[in-house]
Amino acid sequence: MSTEEQKEEIKDISSKQENSSEVPKAEEAGKVVESQKDTTSEEKKEETTEKKEDDGKKDLSFDEAEVLKQVEFYFSDTNLPHDKFLWTTSQKNDGWVPIQTIANFKRMRRFQPLEAIVNALRKSPELLEVDEAGEKVRRMIPLVRVDNKSVMERSVYCKGFGDEKDDTQIALEKFFEENAGPISAVRMRRDDDKKFKGSVFVEFKEPDVANKFLEKVKTAPLKWGEDELTIMSKKEYVDMKAELHKNDPPKFSSKRRRFDAFKEMDRQRPGKYSNRGRKFKKQRSSNASEEKPSAASE
């Protein structure tokens, strides 16, 4: 073998040794990269878990005043007579309703824990009472039949709220409390398919609050976002709609009649409807005998 050939062979051997030594280096480098990826992945998972836990803590907010306000609304003269589920539940047990049942209501789920809700309800000045075990709540004051005329005088119609969002009801209540004053209820108006119409009836606690609000918006119109609201008294709205549709043919709505606890109590009152029913049947029987055609005329 010539000297040149020997040099070439030595060079090839050296090159192969270098390449073979680079393979484990590359493999080692790959392992390091994979290890870094795994570490980064684990860190991201931990961050995501922590974020979810933080988000969960944020959702489980608690405000005693807000809890008490919401539950007192459920048992108020404005709501209870028309809340069929709550009324029926309360009538099964001398007015008592399980606090856990109320805690499961959509507006109440964000308030935790249950013990804190119980403590908040115990601070009701006069409307509510909690049993000794802290398991049930009921209304202490007798239910008052609200005069429809009084409700009309305290109510306002507002339109221009756009599409409904998850927090629209809460946002509307805060909006009117901040811009007008104490409210009894904000009723979101819906069509036959239960879609929000973008308008509401606001029932204030006092007629003066409603009147001052109507005077205020005459010179300082209110906006919801970028849209100016249409605002008038409920009576004005009802009269306007009646005039607009006075010549229309009768319209039959698929909506169910609103539940009325007072009518239910009237039905259960002994003698109130039973006597009336007997008189009605007797009168119908008498009229039927008078109007029944004779055999000859048939």
Swiss-Prot record:
Comp. bias intervals (Basic residues): 275-284
UniProt-annotated location(s): Nucleus
GO MF annotation, one: tRNA binding
Region (Disordered) residue spans: 1-60, 242-298
Boundaries of every HTH La-type RNA-binding domain copy: 57-148
Function: RNA chaperone that binds to tRNA precursors and promotes their folding and maturation. Also able to bind misfolded tRNAs. Acts as a regulator of tRNA methylation: binding to nascent pre-tRNAs inhibits the activity of tRNA (guanine(26)-N(2))-dimethyltransferase trm1.
Full protein name: La protein homolog
Organism for this UniProt entry: Schizosaccharomyces pombe (strain 972 / ATCC 24843)
Phylogenetic placement of the source organism: Eukaryota, Fungi, Dikarya, Ascomycota, Taphrinomycotina
